[in-house]
């Protein structure tokens, strides 16, 4: 079954996860999500497959997040998803998913759960 990977080629974990997929002959669609960010509905679908909330895939250490000075207790899930769509650098990476499930490739070995 083909999988999709939200990939950032500048991220070592993302590169390692993609390499694992290729090594195991997995047909994968690579989305350079910084250039082609997922829509709010796509993020919601991925979150459902991950069984996580938006704050759990949020990269709070990114400088742009700190500049927003947002309190996670005071922002709604929809607002957080919109923020990630507008600023995709805030989305944890890599995320590998298919029609049924998803994993975050941190550590890259998590990617093997998609095989």
Predicted regions and their residues:
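Local sequence-structure signature of Cys/Sec-based thiol-disulfide redox active-site neighborhoods
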Residues: 1-24, 28-33
């Amino acid at each position: 079954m083909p999988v999709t990977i939200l990939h950032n080629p500048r991220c070592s974990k993302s590169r390692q996860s993609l390499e694992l997929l290729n090594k195991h002959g997995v047909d994968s669609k690579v989305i350079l999500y910084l250039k082609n960010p997922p829509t709010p509905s796509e993020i919601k679908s991925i979150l459902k497959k991950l069984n996580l909330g938006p704050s759990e895939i949020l990269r709070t250490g990114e400088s742009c997040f700190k500049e927003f000075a947002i309190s996670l207790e005071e922002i709604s899930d929809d607002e957080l998803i919109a923020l990630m769509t507008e600023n995709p650098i805030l989305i944890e990476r890599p995320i590998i998913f298919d029609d049924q499930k998803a994993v975050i490739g941190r550590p890259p070995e998590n990617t093997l759960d998609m095989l």
